[in-house]
Structure formats: C-alpha cells, structure tokens
Amino acid sequence: MKILITGGCGFVGSNLAIYLKKKIRNAQISSLDNLVRKGSRLNKIRLKNHNIRNYNFNIEKFDKFKKLPKFNLIIDCCAEPAIEASKRETNRVFNTNLIGTFNV
C-alpha cells in the first residue's frame, strides 16, 4: 500500500507517518511538506531515519501535485496553524489552508 501524508513533516503528520510505518509493515509511506516551519525541517530528518520519503513543495501548486506517483491513500494533515501568520499573510494562509486542501 502506498500512503501519502500531506503536511507530513508537521507535528501531527510526522508522528502519524512514523506510527503507520511501524504498524503497516509493507506500506510505502511518503510525506509532502513545504518545510516552511523550523520544526518541519527537523521532522524531515526523523522521517528519513524511518525510510519515509518527503516531497518538498506547497500543495497549492496543483501542477506539481498532479505529477506525484499514484497513492492508494492520501491523508491530509497540512495547514498553516499560526494565528499571527494569518493576520500578516492572509493570501498565503488562504491558499495553503483552502486551495491546497481542495487540490488534495
């Protein structure tokens, strides 16, 4: 089974990816994350240590999303959670949280 977790380098996504990797032995787990947050870059290393591949781009880029390999299951864990960012960068937060989720 091939599983993609969007927001896979975030707190929820990375822990879910590692959990699924341990529970479903023959699963191919992949992550998609834009790595904007510092914690995401650190979690990318954790995922690599568990043999979980990461695709690095923002899900609002639908043309790139369409070029990904086919997956049996996509779990959407991506979002821009920072309240302060939503005040400063309304368009970016809207595009990530709404347009990006629509693309998934």
Model-based region annotation:
Residues 1-104:
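N-terminal Rossmann-like NAD(P)+-binding domain of SDR-like oxidoreductases, especially those catalyzing
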